[in-house]
Regions:
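Conserved substrate/cofactor phosphate-moiety recognition/catalytic segment
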Residues: 38-81, 107
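A glycine- and Lys/Arg-enriched "phosphate-lid" helix/loop adjacent to the NTP-binding pocket
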Residues: 106-182
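NTP-dependent small-molecule kinase module
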Residues: 3, 154-227
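Glycine-rich phosphate-binding loop used to anchor ATP phosphates in small-molecule kinases
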Residues: 69-137
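Hydrophobic positions on the alpha1 helix immediately C-terminal to the Walker A/P-loop
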Residues: 32, 36
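Conserved lysine of the Walker
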Residues: 29
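P-loop (Walker A) phosphate-binding loop of NTP-binding proteins
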Residues: 24
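Hydrophobic anchor at the beta1->P-loop junction of P-loop NTPases
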Residues: 21
Length: 227
């Protein structure tokens, strides 16, 4: 999928004072986002808002196989994440983000394959906002990509105990496998296309070790002032 993201017609890419943490569902993004944000004294922007009632309803219906809700979920999540990212960057303080809109397109492609017309609409919207992000707002200065093995993914899903994921796991397993098979490669290619500095990390490493590896990269490459 990333090969379709052609920056040839784009202006010079802008780089924001931000770090993004990306990866498969259950990879430990939120945990690492929190730990890294605390270590860097940075603003932290999480993907999920547990108090967002609409988000929770759409997510539940998505895992129950409701195709209409899947479309609404993707659009709602995309718009919310874009605005959260924009607001975070406008604060001018170093920010750590739990996922970005670059990953939304992968989820939409997986969830909306049954409706190519709606995906075409979504894709056009995604590209318009992505152009705004890359040369008006700014891409993350560093993208951390968590690599999660399938068995570990399954174990974590059941361990964290979200009913919407567990109750419908057998039905959604083909979707999860398809997503898992392409996730890391998709993110790596996306970073390469847009010239985003990235680091692939083993999700099975202790969080403290992951943070140390990230800090070593930041310091050795002098990515952020004062770190």
């Amino acid at each position: 999928m990333a090969k379709n993201l052609d920056p040839a017609n784009f202006q010079k890419i802008k780089v924001a004072n931000a770090i993004a943490i990306g990866g498969m569902i259950g990879a430990g993004k939120s945990t690492l986002t929190r730990a890294l944000g605390n270590k860097l004294n940075a603003d932290v922007i999480f993907e999920l808002n547990e108090n967002d009632e609409l988000q929770n309803i759409l997510l539940k219906r998505l895992y129950e196989g409701d195709e209409t809700s899947a479309i609404a979920f993707q659009v709602y999540f995309f718009c919310t994440r874009f605005e959260n990212y924009r607001q975070g960057i406008l604060n001018h303080k170093l920010s750590v983000f739990d996922r970005t809109i670059f990953e939304d397109r992968l989820f939409a492609h997986q969830n909306m394959t049954a409706d190519p017309i709606m995906f075409g609409f979504y894709d056009a919207m995604w590209h318009d906002k992505t152009k705004e992000l890359i040369y008006s707002i700014g891409v993350p200065k560093l993208y951390i990509i968590l690599d999660l093995k399938w068995d570990e993914f399954k174990e974590r899903i059941f361990k964290r105990g979200r009913n919407s994921e567990i109750e419908n796991f057998s039905v959604n397993e083909p979707y999860f496998r398809s997503l898992h098979n392409v996730y890391v490669d998709y993110l790596v290619k996306t970073c390469q296309i847009y010239g985003i500095n990235y680091l692939v990390l083993d999700s099975s490493l202790p969080t403290e070790k992951q943070v140390d590896i990230i800090l070593d990269k930041i310091k050795s490459e002098k990515l952020f002032d004062g770190v």
